[in-house]
Each structure stands twice: as C-alpha cells, then as structure tokens.
Amino acid sequence: MSVSKKDVEYVAELARLSFSEEQKEGFMEDLNSILGYVDKLSELDTDNVDIIVNPYYIENKFREDEVEESMDLKDVIKNAPKNLEEYIVVPKIID
C-alpha cells in the first residue's frame, strides 16, 4: 500500500489545511516511508516471543463527586461580557 498525492490532498481537505505542491510531495514521501517501516514490522516472526507486560500497575485515581455551592446566577451574568436574559452569549466558532 502506498500513499498518493491524491490521498495527501484528501486528508488535508478533511483537516481544512492547505499545502504547497512541494509540501504535499514531502508528506507523500514521509508517509510512504512510515508505511514501508510498518510493512517490515509485519514480516517479523513473533510466534516464539514472550508477551511483554508492563511491570508497573497503573490505576486511575478517581474521587467522589461532591456538590459544592456555586456562584449566584446574577453574579455570573453580571461578569459575562455579553448575555441574553439568563444565557451567556459567546462567539460562533463552528461554521
């Protein structure tokens, strides 16, 4: 499997990025190099290799949710730069 210029353009379009032709060629070469390395790794025989386990036990540290008193709505609205009744108005960020 190889990455074509069209693939690079498609991913750039999805990410809403624009690149020069030279940059597209560079990305295409880099991605093809990475995929070549992955292909080499897939050729390795790992049937007789022991499973590697992380020696450190990692555990999520969760805390109990505790209800705390929050600011009064009037104070929140008073500190907001712009409001519409009980709502804070923010700039639109998504088209």
UniProtKB/Swiss-Prot annotation:
Pfam families: GatC. It catalyses: L-glutamyl-tRNA(Gln) + L-glutamine + ATP + H2O = L-glutaminyl-tRNA(Gln) + L-glutamate + ADP + phosphate + H(+); L-aspartyl-tRNA(Asn) + L-glutamine + ATP + H2O = L-asparaginyl-tRNA(Asn) + L-glutamate + ADP + phosphate + 2 H(+). This is Glutamyl-tRNA(Gln) amidotransferase subunit C 1. Its EC number is 6.3.5.-. Belongs to the GatC family. It is an enzyme of class 6 (ligase). Signal peptide: none annotated. GO terms for molecular function: asparaginyl-tRNA synthase (glutamine-hydrolyzing) activity; ATP binding; glutaminyl-tRNA synthase (glutamine-hydrolyzing) activity. Keywords: ATP-binding, Ligase, Nucleotide-binding, Protein biosynthesis. One of its GO terms (biological process) is glutaminyl-tRNAGln biosynthesis via transamidation. The keyword Plastid does not apply. Heterotrimer of A, B and C subunits. It comes from the Bacteria. It comes from Clostridium acetobutylicum (strain ATCC 824 / DSM 792 / JCM 1419 / IAM 19013 / LMG 5710 / NBRC 13948 / NRRL B-527 / VKM B-1787 / 2291 / W). Allows the formation of correctly charged Asn-tRNA(Asn) or Gln-tRNA(Gln) through the transamidation of misacylated Asp-tRNA(Asn) or Glu-tRNA(Gln) in organisms which lack either or both of asparaginyl-tRNA or glutaminyl-tRNA synthetases. The reaction takes place in the presence of glutamine and ATP through an activated phospho-Asp-tRNA(Asn) or phospho-Glu-tRNA(Gln).
